[in-house]
Regions:
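Short amphipathic alpha-helix used as the core "switch/output" element in two-component signaling
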Residues: 65-76
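Acidic, metal-coordinating helix/loop segments flanking the phosphotransfer/catalytic sites
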Residues: 33-52
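Two-component/phosphorelay signaling modules centered on CheY-like receiver
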Residues: 14-32
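Active-site residues of response regulator receiver
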Residues: 56, 84
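Non-catalytic signal-transmission and effector/linker regions of two-component phosphorelay proteins
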Residues: 1-8, 14, 18, 49, ...
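A Lys-centered signature of the CheY-like receiver
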Residues: 106
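Acidic catalytic/metal-coordinating carboxylates
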Residues: 36, 63-66
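Alpha4 helix (beta4-alpha4-beta5 surface) of REC/receiver domains from two-component response regulators
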Residues: 66, 87-103, 111, 115
Length: 126
């Protein structure tokens, strides 16, 4: 069994999603990319136990905060990174530290996302 941590990436922007997947996989993480919260995720039938979820705030069906709350119902230990081009100008995110572990403004650098992920979930040495 591969000890690499699993990361869920949900972003409806294909370029951002693919860039995140590429960056995280090269860093040694296993990644499940999603465009939106799928029916299986909504029902709590997650294909993996995720250590971290990187969620865009603006999604087609629900906002990232609602996705984070649903995810935490089924995987309470999953750490949440909320990304948005509107940070820090989203007043609805104020006081959400119980749900969201880190906030990261778009655009972000490769080093910035890797630093945040490593703080929440380091890749084990091979």
């Amino acid at each position: 069994m591969d000890p690499s941590p699993w990361i869920l990436v949900i972003d409806d922007d294909r370029w951002t999603r693919e860039a995140l997947v590429s960056i995280l996989r090269r860093a040694g993480y296993q990644v499940t990319p999603q465009e939106r919260l799928g029916q299986e995720l909504d029902a709590g039938q997650f294909p993996q136990r995720y250590q971290v979820a990187v969620l865009d705030y603006h999604l087609p069906d629900l906002n990232g905060l609602e996705v984070a709350r649903r995810l935490k119902q089924f995987q309470p230990d999953c750490r949440i990174v909320m990304i948005s081009s509107e940070l820090p100008n989203l007043p609805e995110l104020a006081g959400q530290e119980a749900v969201v572990d880190r906030f990261l403004a778009k655009p972000f650098s490769k080093d910035a996302i890797l630093e945040v992920i490593a703080q929440l979930c380091p890749v084990p040495a091979k």
